[in-house]
Amino acid sequence: MNVAIFGSTGFVGKYILNSLIKNNHKVYTLVRKESEHKIKHINPINIINGEITNSTSLEQTMMNCSTVIYNIGIIREFKSKGISYKKLHLDYAKHVIDKAKLLNIKHFILMSANGVKDFGTGYQTTKYHAEEHLKKSGLNYTIFRPSLIFGKPKNDQEFCTQLRDTMIKLPIPAPIFFQNLNIFKAGNFKMSPIHVENVADFFVKSIENKTHYSQIYELGGLESFDWKAIIKTISIAVRKNKLTVPAPV
């Protein structure tokens, strides 16, 4: 199959690229010129240089494809640099979805996230509205909502690496979160981390498989951990005795 992917230069995107190639798909990806070096070593792929806001660039990326994967996302905003949840999760996604509809793309696969909802955090809400736009587009779609994704970083910032660098290694207590004034339940919420290779394989196995059309899949690993256990596990791995403090969400 000919597959277009948007969001191929990050942690998860590179794994999806490799899985696509391993399964003999012909891959097209839109990449800004300054980011091309991140995936130039992955072959064979067809790289289109351009901006996602440019209609011609989108058409060049998708015109020969039957499936589109939208994997653009961030877990932290930098609004001073124009990097926001709304722009990357929603505005850009809508732009690609609408173009895919015009090009009669057979199957659209969207990377969403576990716990998305309307009127949630900025991250949750923008992911939710991207899902809703896709569901109303008339395209055959598959939506994946993974839990925390971990794996070998390969010079990228995956979850455990970011947690280590931005929380565990800092000389201040790590926050353990709670909601609705339930301070005694701080850090007790459960998560089921999933390996990045499993996520990539789920994406690729769903391609143009009609049993996966109009489906939303929540992805998680075999085991569940609470936030306190995750903090403790990573702290032990980096040999650091980490204090924690309750923090409201």
Indicate where each model-derived feature is located.
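A conserved pocket-lining segment of Rossmann-fold NAD(P)-dependent short-chain dehydrogenase/reductase
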Residues: D165-I194, N198, F202-S206, K210-Y213, ...
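Conserved glycine-rich Rossmann-like NAD(P)H-binding loop of the short-chain dehydrogenase/reductase
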Residues: H25-R32
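Structural motif
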Residues: N2, S66-T67, H107
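N-terminal Rossmann NAD(P)H-binding glycine-rich loop of SDR-like oxidoreductase domains
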Residues: V3-N23
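NAD(P)H-binding glycine-rich loop region in Rossmannoid oxidoreductase-like domains
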Residues: S35-H41, I45-L103, N114-F119
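Conserved Rossmann-fold NAD(P)-dependent oxidoreductase catalytic core, especially the SDR/UDP-sugar
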Residues: Y28, I74, G82-P153
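Mid/C-terminal beta-alpha module of Rossmann-like enzyme folds, strongest
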Residues: F202-V249
